[in-house]
Amino acid sequence: MFVDFHTHVFHPRIAEKAKMKLAEHYRLFCRCKGTPEDLLLRAGRAGIDHCVALCAATSALQVRPCNAYACYLQNNYPRITAFGSLHPDCADWKKELDKLRASGVRGIKLHPDFQHFRLDDKRLFPMFEEAQKDFIFLIHIGDSLPPEENPSCPYKMAAILDAFPRLNVIAAHLGGFRQWKYALDALAGRDVWMDTSSCMKEIPGDVLRAILKKHPRERLVFGTDYPIMDPQDEIDALQRRTRFSDAEVDEILGNGTHLLFG
């Protein structure tokens, strides 16, 4: 089974608005519609069997509706595994975890840059402690600011791994979007998963080769960042930039199966 481990889908009422926010922040054009139906159509064309849809609440007030949508996706789209969201300002985060568990949601997405908190916020620690038993975390890492100024960075992620060695976590964007040289220093080779989303257009070739040499291929999962990228385009870009063989690309596409389903 081939898995796209990094996608975003939105309710039709807000899909265009959500895409506009993505486009404004990253100064790019979202190629796809951003709906579950469009995601699954494009994934199928690319030979992808299953997708992980990530939800991230931009404020504490958005945690409940965000997780309600994750539960809806989980229970209405058999080819989608949904990840819910937490926020350090949310006082009822334990209840939210219970709701996610009851609906079969076993993943949490954190995006400090969009959610307006820092990844080194100690209020996250009780959440990691409680959820590490039965949840996978996918955490956005990196942006254009220097690591010490950016809400997320590879060094903050490394500190979390030190504090929670049993945490099952995916460091998005090969460990640090636009901070790949720091990801090479702080995360590559560690006991952490990385996804390949939103990397192939920007990552310098020498840094990409160094990360792939240092980080085991069996700890990489494929991701498109849909609706920003089309799945087939991203598969092609992955193979072109990495120069992996068909079998090696298939291995990365299949790694998400082991992570999701054992």
Give names to the regions the model predicted:
Residues 40-46, 67-79, 96-104, 125-133, ...:
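Acidic (Asp/Glu)-rich catalytic clusters
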Residues 33, 57-61, 88-91, 103-184:
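Divalent metal-binding pocket/active-site signature
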